[in-house]
UniProtKB/Swiss-Prot annotation:
The name this protein goes by in its record: Large ribosomal subunit protein uL24
Keyword flag Ribosomal protein: yes
InterPro entries to which the protein is assigned, alphabetical: KOW, Rib_uL2_dom2, Ribosomal_uL24, Ribosomal_uL24_CS, Ribosomal_uL24_KOW, Translation_prot_SH3-like_sf
SUBUNIT field: Part of the 50S ribosomal subunit.
SUPFAM superfamilies: Translation proteins SH3-like domain
Record Pfam families: KOW, ribosomal_L24
HAMAP family recorded: Ribosomal_uL24_B
GO biological process, one term: translation
Taxonomic lineage from the root: Bacteria, Pseudomonadati, Pseudomonadota, Alphaproteobacteria, Hyphomicrobiales
Record keyword Kinase present: no
Length: 103
């Protein structure tokens, strides 16, 4: 089971966006990276195609999972993740507050 999943609210721990929060758009476990909305924005020079115009577009670039931490559901600060079995299901738990992350 992954600690960071699509739809999670995360906090950036290091890099140019340190301290900023965003939502995970996509997780790439093989590369140990994730796309986070509004984080690690890069400019891409787009060539003209039949459907798109030429120009410079901004888009999110992947960020390594080690630079992300789940935002605690209670106070929004970065927390580590633990696992617990409740009602026969494995759920994620915030180590900081003990709050469940999976509904």
């Amino acid at each position: 089971m992954q600690k960071i999943r699509k739809g999670d609210s995360v906090v950036v721990l290091s890099g140019k966006d340190k301290g900023r929060k965003g939502e995970v758009l996509k997780v790439m476990p093989k590369d140990e990276q994730a796309l986070v909305s509004g984080i690690n924005i890069v400019k891409r020079h787009q060539r003209q195609t039949q459907t798109q115009e030429a120009g410079i577009i901004s888009k999110e670039a992947p960020i390594h999972l080690s630079n992300l931490a789940i935002a605690d559901p209670k106070d929004g600060k970065p927390t580590r993740i633990g696992f617990r079995v409740e009602d026969g299901k494995k759920v994620r738990v915030a180590k900081r507050s003990g709050a469940l992350i999976d509904g």
